[in-house]
Amino acid sequence: MALADSTRGLPNGGGGGGGSGSSSSSAEPPLFPDIVELNVGGQVYVTRRCTVVSVPDSLLWRMFTQQQPQELARDSKGRFFLDRDGFLFRYILDYLRDLQLVLPDYFPERSRLQREAEYFELPELVRRLGAPQQPGPGPPPSRRGVHKEGSLGDELLPLGYSEPEQQEGASAGAPSPTLELASRSPSGGAAGPLLTPSQSLDGSRRSGYITIGYRGSYTIGRDAQADAKFRRVARITVCGKTSLAKEVFGDTLNESRDPDRPPERYTSRYYLKFNFLEQAFDKLSESGFHMVACSSTGTCAFASSTDQSEDKIWTSYTEYVFCRE
């Protein structure tokens, strides 16, 4: 009977130790998988668990070392969910991989990224984002046509300009030889300062193109004189660089069809929250844009192919191209 008891792993039997060990191991919390899927604000990231726990005492480190998987929020597909900025999280994840901060030359979301780093409790990343930017090797920031602090609101340095050293006895009003060299063309003739594609002549606004389009309908025939048959515009679309479109149209720009588009990328899926072409023209004009081209196509639909006396319903698609130099 004692042998039978030990075989069954009773507390007083010889197999009790094995049964107790099995019970304790089953009581341990389940481990996280080596490959972790994260849903951050609708953006899905797949990474290794060792990456997200690479910074001790951070928010992600506590989530994936001090908590159990069932305690964390998940989406409908079982991915761990974080209600944060999905676009900026890519830079957080890049930092966690090798603890290095690498940002694009033109990055207007620096302050928002610093706020995300504070949320994820990454003090070293917060410190680096808050420190003044130091010019790296290669061309100076002014030759790359970027902002002083990587922000939309900061002043652009004219291309070819560098801070001249104040020479002893030099007049404060004397022209800088650096500026004189920057204003000359390679052939020796006088020329304006060289510009990057995103910098305008006044050094404060970026150049570029914006195309707005709309699909409209109107009637030609007996009802053409009625007020109800005037131009009808269903939606005004906006195509161009994301940062330019946001600068011109601001809160009147609907980004729902192309969210989290980086500022340096282009899009053709934005549209305006209003339907008045002249309002769009006014906003473009106030921002320094002028029209350089337009095109239109139209089709006609008959109510009956045999009865030509019926009113003709026309639909058209029109695009206007605006430029700021």
Curated annotation (Swiss-Prot):
GO function term, MF aspect, one: identical protein binding
Name the record gives this protein: BTB/POZ domain-containing protein KCTD12
Residues that bear Phosphoserine: 151, 171, 185, 200
Compositional bias segments (type: Gly residues): 11-21
Subunit structure: Interacts as a tetramer with GABBR1 and GABBR2.
Localization: Presynaptic cell membrane; Postsynaptic cell membrane
PANTHER family hit by this protein: BTB_POZ DOMAIN-CONTAINING PROTEIN KCTD12 (PTHR14499:SF29), POTASSIUM CHANNEL TETRAMERIZATION DOMAIN-CONTAINING (PTHR14499)
